[in-house]
Amino acid sequence: QFPPYQGGGGMIEEVKKETITFAPSPNKFEAGTMQTAEVVAFKESLNFIEKLGVDKIYNHENQVLEYGLDKIKKNNSVTVIGNPKERGSIISFTIKGIHPHDIATILDEEGIAIRAGHHCCQIYHEILGTPATARASLGIYNTKEDMDALSAGIEKCKKVFKI
């Protein structure tokens, strides 16, 4: 009995000048083209995780994370944000005197992908007293060499901003 929340192909049974008849559920809620590629990719992702093993993935991410944190924390201009025991495989940080969006831009030029911004937690950033943070999210595909590149990228940021 709920009306559809969006329009698109496959969700309409009949259209007349004065009325529209929607397809029966669930089709009236599945407008547009089905995300076939995403469904296939999801299946393959699950196969990959199952083959590799969650413990192996967790241990690898932790090793890379600890290596990266050790390198980054040695830099006096960098503040690492967050509780070390609850961080997961994420490094959120700021560099004194450089806006996180500038950090992200410079790192991007070096081929390093991070995010910068509030990360959907503006209140936390208000509490921290920072307009935003830079965030490196690690996964099974990251290596210690990636952390070396991140550390070198941070040094480049400092050089560009003469810090």
Cite the ranges covered by each PLM segment.
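Pyridoxal 5′-phosphate
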Residues: Q1-I163
